[in-house]
From Swiss-Prot:
EC supergroup of this enzyme: transferase
Name this polypeptide is given: tRNA (guanine-N(1)-)-methyltransferase
UniProt xrefs under Pfam families: tRNA_m1G_MT
Single GO MF annotation: tRNA (guanine(37)-N1)-methyltransferase activity
Catalytic reactions of this protein: guanosine(37) in tRNA + S-adenosyl-L-methionine = N(1)-methylguanosine(37) in tRNA + S-adenosyl-L-homocysteine + H(+)
One Gene Ontology term from the biological process aspect of the record: tRNA N1-guanine methylation
Keywords of this entry: Cytoplasm, Methyltransferase, S-adenosyl-L-methionine, Transferase, tRNA processing
GO cellular component: cytosol
Subcellular location(s) per record: Cytoplasm
InterPro entries noted in UniProt: Alpha/beta_knot_MTases (IPR029028), tRNA_m1G_MeTrfase_C_sf (IPR023148), tRNA_m1G_MeTrfase_TrmD (IPR002649), tRNA_m1G_MTases_N (IPR029026), tRNA_MeTrfase_TRMD/TRM10 (IPR016009)
Keyword Methyltransferase: yes
Source organism phylogeny: Bacteria, Pseudomonadati, Pseudomonadota, Gammaproteobacteria, Pseudomonadales
Taxonomic source organism: Pseudomonas putida (strain ATCC 700007 / DSM 6899 / JCM 31910 / BCRC 17059 / LMG 24140 / F1)
Subunit structure: Homodimer.
EC code(s) of this entry: 2.1.1.228
Gene that produces this protein: trmD
């Protein structure tokens, strides 16, 4: 896992300034850990209207992105990367993006992301060029740009040196298959609500135990499906039972 180059084929390259100019991803770009290059299919059209879409065969609403501009943009991206980059199409038909999948993508040296628009892209392009399809959820968006940015952000967090604290990525939600624990900062008391005493104790073993218990409890209450696919250790089962007893007694 090292530096990452991401080429994005998109009709709206300006949107990716959210990645290159703000936050952790911007810092990664400035540090040379991340490179994001956009390719606009409109630049590969030959008609005066720069047409990138057409009506779907068989009828129906909306328009479909044409093969040729996408293919030409992909050729340019491949030539520029100089590597066998994995081509990913952000699509509601794709597998749901998980933290485990993000870890796998973070091992790549380069990625090419296809951000579709309209009703989607011509299926023949997908069959000929796309290695993987990924979805960020079971809902409809106007295009693939936002999912592409989600993927880039998630992968960037795993690049060595991208985060300010070496443990931050390891402690994120989903990293170990659980939701994150609650977090608090100053002041210790706000509107008569106190920070849990254990976090002020300075006892790191007790703090780690409390955080794991909270993570297990939150996951049980909010995303029980995550626990179904995770084998709990004896200590984790004990902590979860303790959490549930404390919740029921409160």
């Amino acid at each position: 896992m090292g530096n990452l180059r991401v080429d994005v084929i998109t009709l709206f390259p300006e949107m990716f300034s959210a990645i290159t100019e703000y936050g952790i991803t911007s810092r990664a770009v400035k540090q040379g850990l991340l490179q994001v290059i956009c390719w606009n299919p409109r630049d590969y059209t030959t008609d005066r209207h720069h047409t990138v879409d057409d009506r779907p065969f068989g009828g129906g609403p909306g328009m479909v992105m044409k093969i040729k501009p996408l293919e030409d943009a992909l050729v340019s991206a491949r030539q520029a990367t100089g590597a066998a980059a994995k081509v990913i199409y952000l699509s509601p038909q794709g597998r749901k993006l998980t933290q485990q999948a993000v870890k796998g993508l973070a091992e790549q040296e380069s990625l090419i992301l296809i951000a579709g628009r309209y009703e989607g892209i011509d299926e023949r392009f997908i069959e000929a060029h796309v290695d993987e399809e990924w979805s960020i959820g079971d809902y409809v968006l106007s295009g693939g740009e936002l999912p592409a940015m989600v993927l880039i952000d998630a992968v960037t967090r795993l690049l060595p040196g991208a985060l300010g604290h070496v443990d931050s990525a390891e402690e994120d939600s989903f990293t170990d298959g659980l939701l994150d624990c609650p977090h608090y900062t100053r002041p210790e008391v706000y509107a008569d609500q106190r920070v849990p005493d254990v976090l002020l104790s300075g006892n790191h073993a007790h703090i780690r135990r409390w955080r794991m218990k909270q993570s297990l409890g939150r996951t049980f209450e909010r995303r029980a499906d995550l626990l179904e696919s995770r084998s709990l250790s004896g200590e984790e089962k004990k902590l979860l039972e303790e959490y549930l007893r404390e919740r029921d007694d409160s």
